[in-house]
């Protein structure tokens, strides 16, 4: 199967599907259609009925080959790649029998070094796909697409493997947080699903952050600095004051595990107007609400010193911890856990310090945990995919549909 995985991943990663957060269309970029149309053709060649809507959501069905009435399971992956780094002219490189020594990426000065990325030490002997140092790879989440497609191919070639109805979904714009925004849960018509969008071997994730964005707008009064005493209000300094009132220890670079944070993503301005953009994250719903409350309290504390209330705050929720919807349905986690055990894969159920499409889909009525893909260092030139771990991910998909058929 390795050669098929390499060929398919190469074919998909060389198609530029970068999403654009500034766009107002869905998909956010026309080039995402290039991969969507290719996948539509490939699914149809496998004999699967497909449904590609005007927003770039591609659904397909592999019909049940058993008489028993078992739950319909879905498998999901996103076609877009991150806007954080160059995604054009991707030139995948193959490392056979990886030896954990530093590897120079193409003709660049970039080096894939286990001292910097220690998780590479667990991949000794694996076949890796990496970049040439000039682009991201796009294995996030094209590896997930490959794994779903190869699992479907295998099931088609092995009709003796019993399974219920399987729904497949390939979606746009996950990287800019809009993946589920126009996802039609009723049209997808699955009882539950799994995103193939994790990273390291053994990841099985069903806890995500609660997430919000806060935009702080500071309005100043611009006066000639020579006569500014008791008259000027510097919006930039108001922004600095606002940020200084948040706890220094509760930032991404000083937190881990279940610890939440405030993250200042952008700060720009002039004397007259400054804008701060934060993301707020916490696994605990109560702490999440307290974090949002703290933002409002800081606004009020600063505004109390002025007559015209110069600091404005706009907070918007982005997604919530999917554990709230998944934990009441333990069979959704028990199924992959049984499969992992059968395949001797150690299950890593640590919480996601982020979110997936499943975070939103779970609250839309489609409970959706996340499963590993075998890739790492997403969104940049050091991205890689272990073909060996991808093969295991294919086996997990096959094992899940077998387990559902056997255990109903």
From Swiss-Prot:
InterPro entries: ArgE/DapE_CS, Bact_exopeptidase_dim_dom, Peptidase_M20, Peptidase_M20_dimer, Peptidase_M20B. CDD domains: M20_peptT. PROSITE patterns: ARGE_DAPE_CPG2_1, ARGE_DAPE_CPG2_2. One of its GO terms (cellular component) is cytosol. GO terms for biological process: peptide catabolic process; proteolysis. GO terms for molecular function: metallopeptidase activity; tripeptide aminopeptidase activity; zinc ion binding. Binds 2 Zn(2+) ions per subunit. This is Peptidase T. It comes from Staphylococcus aureus (strain bovine RF122 / ET3-1). The gene is pepT.
């Amino acid at each position: 199967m390795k050669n098929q995985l390499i060929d398919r991943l190469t074919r998909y990663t060389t198609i530029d599907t970068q999403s654009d957060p500034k766009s107002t269309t869905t998909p956010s970029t026309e080039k995402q259609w290039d991969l969507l149309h290719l996948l539509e053709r490939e699914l149809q060649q496998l004999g699967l009925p497909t449904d590609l809507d005007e927003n770039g959501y591609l659904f397909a069905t592999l019909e049940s080959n058993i008489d028993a009435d078992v739950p319909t399971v879905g498998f999901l992956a996103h076609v877009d790649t991150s806007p954080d780094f160059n995604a054009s002219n991707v030139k995948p490189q193959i490392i056979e029998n990886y030896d954990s020594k530093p590897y120079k990426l193409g003709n660049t000065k970039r080096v894939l070094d286990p001292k910097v990325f220690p998780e590479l030490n667990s991949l000794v002997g694996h076949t890796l796909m990496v970049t040439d140092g000039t682009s991201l790879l796009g294995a996030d989440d094209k590896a997930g697409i490959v794994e779903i497609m190869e699992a479907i191919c295998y099931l088609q070639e092995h009709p003796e493997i019993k399974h219920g109805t399987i729904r497949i979904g390939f979606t746009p714009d996950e990287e800019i947080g809009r993946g589920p925004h126009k996802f039609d849960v009723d049209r997808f018509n699955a009882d539950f699903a799994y995103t193939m969008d994790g990273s390291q071997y053994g990841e099985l994730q069903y806890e995500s952050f609660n997430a919000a964005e806060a935009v702080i707008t500071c309005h100043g009064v611009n006066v000639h600095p020579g006569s500014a005493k008791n008259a000027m209000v510097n919006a930039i300094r108001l922004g600095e004051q606002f940020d200084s009132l948040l706890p220094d220890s509760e930032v991404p670079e000083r937190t881990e595990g279940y610890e939440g944070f405030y993250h200042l993503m952008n700060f720009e301005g002039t004397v007259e107007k400054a804008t701060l953009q934060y993301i707020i994250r916490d696994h605990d719903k109560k702490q999440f609400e307290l974090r949002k409350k703290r933002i409002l309290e800081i606004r009020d504390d600063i505004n109390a010193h002025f007559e015209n209330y110069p600091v404005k705050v706009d907070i918007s929720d982005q997604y919530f911890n999917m554990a709230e919807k998944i934990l009441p349905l333990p069979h959704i986690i028990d199924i992959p856990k049984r499969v992992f055990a059968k395949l001797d894969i150690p299950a890593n159920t640590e919480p996601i310090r982020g979110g997936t499409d499943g975070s939103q889909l779970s609250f839309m009525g489609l409970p959706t945990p996340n499963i590993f893909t075998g890739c790492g260092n997403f969104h940049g030139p050091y991205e890689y995919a272990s073909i060996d771990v991808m093969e295991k991910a294919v086996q997990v998909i096959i094992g899940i549909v077998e387990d559902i058929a056997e255990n109903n």
